Amino acid sequence: MRRKSKKIKVLISEVSLRKRMASLAKEIHQATRGQDLVVVGVLKGAFVFMSDLIRHLTQPVTCDFLRISSYDARGKPRQLRLEFDLTQPIANKHVLVVEDIVDTGSSLQFIREHLLSKKPKSLKICALLKKETEKMTPVEFIGFTIKNLYVVGYGMDLNGQYRHLPYLGYLAPK
């Protein structure tokens, strides 16, 4: 049986993403004064964004990843938990967390508390997207502010699909 493909509307084009990666990297470089950074990508959604972003950074970077989950195997919501942690120490290092989207802010707050417990010298957050409805979570670097949409592409998925899209899109209403 063949699944119906959902109609995806372009929200942010591939060209706009490329331009914003360059300007965002400049903002990060200026704010961090070119310090060596440990760039921590939040899996799985941020891997494409992180890959593009670090190629624009001009200071030395090392990369690491972590993964959290807020759903069980059946897709039911549950308490946040760490599924995969950093593989290197970050004590006394400048850390930049790279997240795909800030929606409610609860995941990012969980990540921030977890990483601060490891005693970094500094901790800054960079999110590709922040929903305009989310006002409480501090994010130092934001790629784009968007409306409350379900976004796919550029590493973000819906049931494991659409990560490969070179742009950010949203599901069009029928």
Report each predicted region and the residues it spans.
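PRPP-associated nucleotide enzymes
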Residues: M1-K174
